[in-house]
Amino acid sequence: PVRLAQSAAQNYGITVIPGAEITREPVSIGHFNALFTTDNNLIYDRDPLQALRNAKAQGAIIMHNHPGWRRTSVESPETEQKAYDEGLIGGVETMNGSEFYPKIIDRARERGLFVAANTDIHDSATETYRAQGQLRNMTLILAADNSIEAVREALENRRTLAWSFGTLAGEEQMLKDFFKACVSVREIVSDGKYTTYAVTNNSSLEFMLQGSGTPFRFRPFTSFTAKVRKGESLKWTLLNCWCGENSHPVVEM
């Protein structure tokens, strides 16, 4: 099936990554995706830890799915903790469907994991997202191209950001760099004491900014003007970008 999908996907510019889900009881054990597998028939074992080891042995990158689903906290139960401690986990979902786990951003940073936002969709995207006026969740993979090799390299080096319902999550510097890649600043006028800039959002994503005053929405493909003392930089806290359980990046331009 994977080879058939990969052949058809070439006509649409889609990259199909072979994989398998390793699923057990969600509260006491958890759900995991094994990416870049070579033979799914060799993965299964009654022991979920051994199944994860089998996937890892064939070169798979394992992602921990929805770590807070059906749980009262995101703290890891025993089996899950063992999987982390053995180095079996390479990435983790900070968002799944409409769920967001800010505390998991800290885990990803501390353990060197890529972050992901996925739909876990069981219906059509139109019914679940577009009919509600929303875009589906996205994992932004900062890869050289969309080949399997480039995608894998980006995941291994944690070059991902997670996006869901207008919220971005990931590593602090990457969020800052992403914002600066989306936004341009142009000087309009300077009177020797103050400088006025035009600030443009060149992306299709919205940012929630807070400077020295009230937070405001910086909508896609719009501009605003900002005035600062000559020699000072523009500075905002990105309130819809999360780099930790209780932290947001601050950018200067």
Language model: regions and residue ranges:
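Extended substrate/RNA-proximal surfaces in nucleic-acid metabolism proteins
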Residues: 2-88
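Charged catalytic cores and adjacent phosphate/nucleic-acid-binding surfaces used
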Residues: 26-38, 71-253
